[in-house]
C-alpha cells in the first residue's frame, strides 16, 4: 500500500478554469497523475495537458446529457477510502486513491442573475455531483485535500514544494472547512432564488417570509477598510450574496482616498435620503444625519440652499445630488467648503477636471435608476445575536393623514410637510426639522428629549437670522407634552406634522388650536437609533 500522505493522484472537475492550467502543469511536473471529467479533460487537452478521463477509470460513461458525471461508487471509494481500514476493498476493486480533489460548481449564481434565462434553464445550473464530491472529500480530510477556489492553487504548490509533495493535516482541515462553507453558500443561493420564485406563498405570510424562523444570509468580503468608526477598530466591507435581498450600493469611485467605514455608512444614508426626491435636490450628510436638504431649479441653487441650512455642520460632510453635476457647482463646492465625498449620478468632464485638483476628495458616481430605498431588512448586532426588522422607508401616503387642528394647512404647508417627512425619517431620534418652500431651514436631531430637539432647531434658525414665519415643523415621533407646542408658538411656525399617538394627544391638539397652528397626524413614526 502506498503512503497516502504523498500526493499521487488528483481529480479535477471545474466550471471556473481560472488558474487551472498553471496548477495542472505544476502537478504534472511533480509526476502526479491527473483525472478529470470529460469537459475539464478536453479543456486541459486543448492546452497540451493530459488528464485521464474519469470514465476510463469507472468504465461507466457520462449519461443524461452530462447530468451524471461523477455519481459513481468507484469515484466515491477513491475519495472516502481509509487505507488502514479499507485495504482489502481497495485491492479487490482496484480503487485508485485520490489525494487531491479540485472541484468548483456550475455557476448557479451567475445564471440566476441572468434575466434572459427561464427557470428551467437556471435549474440546469444546479450542481449535484460537485457538492457531493466536495462533501465526501471534506469529510475524509485526513486523507484527501479538497480545493474549491482557484485562488488557493498556488498555496498548495508552495506547500508541496516545501514538503516533498506532502500536504499537512492542518492545511487539509483548513481547506475542508472552506469547502463546507462553499457548499453551504451554494445551497443557500439556490434556496434564496427558489424562495423568491415560489408563487404559492399566501399573501398573509409576508411577515413570516421576511422574518422566517431560521435566517441565513451570506456575505462575501468586498474589501478591507482602513479602520472602523475609530482607528482602534478593524473593519471590512462585505456584500450580501443572498438573492432574497435587494439592497446594494451601486457606486463607482472615480477618484480620491480609499473609502472608510464612516464614509460608507454616510454614503448609505446619502443615497437613501436623496432617493426620496424626484426634483433637483441636494443633501449634505454629516455623522449619520442630514444637516441640509434643498430642492431648487438647478444643482447650483440646491447646493447653496442646503449648505446655508447649517454651514458649520456641513464642514467635512458628504454632498449628494440627484442630477448630473457640472463645473459651475463643482467650483462653488470647492470654493465654499471642505468635503469628504461628493456623490452624483454623473459628472461633466469639466467638473471632473476641477475635482482632479483635489486628489484626496472622493468622487462617487452612483446608478440613479436603482431604488436605494428598496432593501428588505435592517440588521443590528447585539452580543453575537442579531435584531432584524423590516426597513422603515415606507411610502408617504397623505391619504392616511388626519388634519386634527381647527386651522387647515394650506397647499404650501402640505407640500412642505411631505418634504419634511422625507428628511426627518433619515434623522437620528429624537429629531425635529423645519421646512419652508422645500428647503431645510434648521434641524435638531439625536436628542434624548423632544423639547431639546425642538429648542435646537429653533435656536439654529434664529442664530442664522432666518425667519420662521410660515414654516412647517416635522417631528419623527409624537409630542409627549404640550411644552414643545408652547415653544413652537413663539417662533412663527404655522404647521406641525407628526405621527400622533400620545396619551396626551388631545392636550397637544388643544395647544395647537390655542396658538392657531395647523397640525397633521400621519400615523407613521420614524424612530431611528
Curated annotation (Swiss-Prot):
Keyword Transferase: yes
Biological processes per GO annotation: 'de novo' IMP biosynthetic process
Pfam families listed in its UniProt record: AICARFT_IMPCHas, MGS
GO molecular function list: IMP cyclohydrolase activity; phosphoribosylaminoimidazolecarboxamide formyltransferase activity
Reaction(s) this enzyme catalyzes, per UniProt: (6R)-10-formyltetrahydrofolate + 5-amino-1-(5-phospho-beta-D-ribosyl)imidazole-4-carboxamide = 5-formamido-1-(5-phospho-D-ribosyl)imidazole-4-carboxamide + (6S)-5,6,7,8-tetrahydrofolate; IMP + H2O = 5-formamido-1-(5-phospho-D-ribosyl)imidazole-4-carboxamide
Residue ranges of every copy of the MGS-like domain listed in the record: 1-148
Disulfide bonds: none
GO cellular component, one term: cytosol
Pathway: Purine metabolism; IMP biosynthesis via de novo pathway; 5-formamido-1-(5-phospho-D-ribosyl)imidazole-4-carboxamide from 5-amino-1-(5-phospho-D-ribosyl)imidazole-4-carboxamide (10-formyl THF route): step 1/1; Purine metabolism; IMP biosynthesis via de novo pathway; IMP from 5-formamido-1-(5-phospho-D-ribosyl)imidazole-4-carboxamide: step 1/1
Database matches in InterPro entries: AICAR_Tfase_dup_dom_sf (IPR024051), Cytidine_deaminase-like (IPR016193), MGS-like_dom (IPR011607), MGS-like_dom_sf (IPR036914), PurH-like (IPR002695)
Superkingdom to which the source organism belongs: Bacteria
Keyword list, A-Z: Hydrolase, Multifunctional enzyme, Purine biosynthesis, Transferase
E.C. number: 2.1.2.3, 3.5.4.10
Domains: entry comment: The IMP cyclohydrolase activity resides in the N-terminal region.
Entries under PANTHER family matching the protein: BIFUNCTIONAL PURINE BIOSYNTHESIS PROTEIN ATIC (PTHR11692:SF0), BIFUNCTIONAL PURINE BIOSYNTHESIS PROTEIN PURH (PTHR11692)
Family statement drawn from the similarity comment of this UniProt entry: Belongs to the PurH family.
This protein's name: Bifunctional purine biosynthesis protein PurH
Source species taxonomy: Bacteria, Pseudomonadati, Pseudomonadota, Gammaproteobacteria, Enterobacterales
